[in-house]
Each structure stands twice: as structure tokens, then as C-alpha cells.
Amino acid sequence: MRWLYSTSHKDIGLLYLVFAFFGGLLGTSLSMLIRYELALPGRGLLDGNGQLYNVIITGHGIIMLLFMVMPALFGGFGNWLLPIMIGAPDMAFPRLNNISFWLNPPALALLLLSTLVEQGPGTGWTAYPPLSVQHSGTSVDLAILSLHLNGLSSILGAVNMLVTVAGLRAPGMKLLHMPLFVWAIALTAVLVILAVPVLAAALVMLLTDRNINTAYFCESGDLILYQHLFWFFGHPEVYILILPAFGIVSQVVSFFSQKPVFGLTGMICAMGAISLLGFIVWAHHMFTVGLDLDTVAYFTSATMIIAVPTGMKIFSWMATIYSGRVWFTTPMWFAVGFICLFTLGGVTGVVLANAGVDMLVHDTYYVVAHFHYVLSMGAVFGIFAGVYFWGNLITGLGYHEGRAMVHFWLLFIGVNLTFFPQHFLGLAGMPRRMFDYADCFAGWNAVSSFGASISFISVIVFATTFQEAVRTVPRTATTLEWVLLATPAHHALSQVPVLRTASSH
């Protein structure tokens, strides 16, 4: 019962991480069904059932984004580390923290239940009308309710994080003295509070269109209005997922380079700029819906500008590594892998920012490859870097360095084999969300499915990596979470520390 009623941020953070692990297993299993269906042209694993294929696509997208990456980065690492890093005894609202987590399991249960009702929600994770309005039965309604519960959990957690950072910092810890991970979580919380209510409004309108014959989107309504509302949430959501990974990579790179992050103030400003710009570029997902030329020109330009603060972060990490005495262990390899692969995902993002190019490859596998390079290799590599870096601190378990390196290289090779060929498929014109395809696409699809199998093997290796170990304090530790190793109490700190000298990394 301790886990059910616990208000300790450490217990709740660990619950988020365990929940994310099982969500990740579920989402990965669905992705393997997708890849095995697409391994060969013609009828495959699903025997030509296009509706079931689309239900799997919907489940995979929502589970991976909202029930794996977000609980792990924002809920898991954010809850466990944020109070300690700022010298707070716990979160500002511990009981609110508890309910924030316990809204997630019923949300996931509702989503899974929706797939079993009638034919399931075959709408894709975006749930565009009129398809989502015309789905019969209650499957889409259950999925909408699931998203509402998850969104409520996110908003409550974000409010808690912001109040904690604003009001519970240790005496002497000024804003610029906070670790970059804390900055990342705080900015993510702002994005959640501003973006998620817009999604909630769109989903309420979708629900009423489906059930009480309102006409917000269908009939005399405006289908494009839903896309505007959804992507006003959807694009900041990408940064909600990736900003905590930025923070983790900053901590790992600084730690294993044995020096402060290069250009600390610039890194903070870059995250702030990314957060701001993320709200004013949403319509680059909508270049094909008939926007006027001036609007298209604006969103093209604004999207390209995001590359500037993102590039600042990439070059600052590279400068930190270049000028430091680098100690290459598994967390550092995952951080370096993140930098390389996220950069490639960013480059294809700049390509897609051009409206003329985007109109050619919109809804093809080029777009799938782009956002999987940002998320499958960005956010997920950030999660693994954090797990290996702080895993001993959080769980008391160590990891086998050899098996961990096997995990890294299998995952690195697997995800590249899976998603790099999809750029070629997209440029050749293969549409996404289709369970069958022309024979000319068979070669690269076979390579992609083989890469997915390698990635799945890496998950099995990861599950065997951790082992019993003694908690140790790293000699190069510079942030407050490592103090816990000497005082492992139920709540983080029994006495609020007073900072005499500021550690800015």
C-alpha cells in the first residue's frame, strides 16, 4: 500500500519510470507488428486487415508519446531529481503529485479498452475529422477520454513542478545557478500548461460532434479548425518530449567531460527560444491544406529559425566534449549517439520546413523517418542516458558495462537500419499509414524491418543489464542529487542546504 498512497517524490518518480518501461514494451510490440506487416508487399501478418493496421498505428503513436516518453522524462526523472537538484525536501504539493501519477494507469487502460470495442480507433494518433467523427461505436470516445485523463495528469504535474522550482529552491540557489536539467523541466512545465488545454478543447469539440450533433468540424463546421487546434498542441508536444532529454544530455556530457557545459547562459536562452518558437510554427504540419501564400511563407521562415537555438545547443555540447577530458562510459555513448542522431533529424526537419519540398513528401515515409530520428533516437537515447547515469542512484542497481555497450550498439545500428531507409522510401513516394505497397518499395522495407528486429533484440539485452551493486559517489559529482548517497532518507533532504558557492553544471 506504500506505493499507492506514497507522497514521496522518489517513490512517485520510480513509479513513473516503471510505468514508462511497461508502456515502452507495449508500444515497441505494436511497432514490431507494423514492421512485420510491412516486411513484404501483399497480405502479411494482419491478412490485409487495414482497419486493424490503423488501430495498431494509433495505439503505437499515442502509447509511445504519452505513455512512454513523457512519463519517463517529465514524470520519472523530473519527479525524482528536480526537488533534490534545487535543495527542496519534496515537491510543493506531494498529494497532488500522487494523483498526477495515478491518473495514468486508468488512462492507458481506457486506451487499450478502446482497441477492443467494435473495430477500434483507426484514426491515427492525430484523430483528424471527418474520419474520427464517423467512426461507429464508442472506441474513439474511449480514446478521447484516455487522452483527457493523461492531459489532466500532465497539467497537474506541470503546475507542481513550476511551483516547486519557483518557491522551494534552497537559499543561495539563484535561477542561473540551477542545473540545466531543472531548467529543461521548468520550461517543459510551461509548455504543458499552455499547450495541453488547447488539445483538451479540441477533443471536447470532437466528442460533442460525435455524440450530440454539434458542427464544430463536420457538416457546416471547419475541418481545418481541428488541425489548427491539434497542431497548436502537437508541435509544442514535440518539445515537451525533447527538452527534458536536452537537460539529461547536458548533465551527462558535463559530468563525463569533467567540465561545465560550454556557454551555460546561452544554453538556457536556447531552450527558452526553442520553447517560445515551438508555439508559433504549428502550421508547418498543414502546408497541403490550402493556406495562402503569405501564411506559408511565414511558417516556413519561422520553422527554419528554430534551427538556430537548436544549433547553439548542438555546438555547445560539442565544445564541451572537445575541451574536456572525456570519460567514455555507457551514458556518455548514449549522449553522443543522441547528439549525432538528433542532428540528422534536425537536418531533415530543415528540409521539411521548405513548403515546396514538404508538399511533395507530406504524409510519406520521409516524414516518418524525420520524427523518428528526433523521437526514437532523440528522446529515447536521452532516456537511456539518464537510466544508465542515474540508475544506481534511483534503484541501487548497477549495470554490466559490457552488456550495456552491446545494448547501445545494437540499438544504434538497429534504429538507423530501421529509419534511414525510410528517407528513400518517402522520396520515392511511399505513403505512410498504408498496410500494403507497390513492389518497387519492397527492398528498403525489408531492410527497415530487419533493423527493427535488431532494435527489439537490444531491448532484451537491456532487460538483462542491471545487477546488484553498491551505491557510490562519483568523484566528479557537482550537483546535489549525489549528496543523497550519504543520506538515503524517505524524503530527499531532512535539512534544507544553504549554497555558499554556486555550481552551474
From Swiss-Prot:
Bound cofactor: record note: Binds 2 heme A groups non-covalently per subunit.
Cross-link (1'-histidyl-3'-tyrosine (His-Tyr)): H235-Y239
Compartments where located: Mitochondrion inner membrane
GO cellular component: mitochondrial inner membrane; respiratory chain complex IV
UniProt: Mg(2+) binding residues: H362, D363
Obligatory cofactor(s): heme; Cu cation
Binding sites annotated in the UniProt record for Ca(2+): E37, G42
Catalytic activity, as annotated: 4 Fe(II)-[cytochrome c] + O2 + 8 H(+)(in) = 4 Fe(III)-[cytochrome c] + 2 H2O + 4 H(+)(out)
Domain of life: Eukaryota
InterPro entries reported in the protein's UniProt record: Cyt_c_oxase-like_su1_dom, Cyt_c_oxase-like_su1_sf, Cyt_C_Oxase_1, Cyt_c_Oxase_su1_BS, Cyt_c_oxase_su1_dom
Pfam families given in the database record: COX1
Transmembrane segments: 14-34, 55-75, 98-118, 143-163, 180-200, 229-249, 261-281, 302-322, 332-352, 374-394, 408-428, 446-466
Chain sites annotated for binding Fe(II)-heme a: H60, H372
Keyword hit for Electron transport: yes
Membrane topology summary: Multi-pass membrane protein
Subunit structure: Component of the cytochrome c oxidase (complex IV, CIV), a multisubunit enzyme composed of a catalytic core of 3 subunits and several supernumerary subunits. The complex exists as a monomer or a dimer and forms supercomplexes (SCs) in the inner mitochondrial membrane with ubiquinol-cytochrome c oxidoreductase (cytochrome b-c1 complex, complex III, CIII).
Family: Belongs to the heme-copper respiratory oxidase family.
Protein name as catalogued: Cytochrome c oxidase subunit 1
Biological source species: Chlamydomonas reinhardtii (Chlamydomonas smithii)
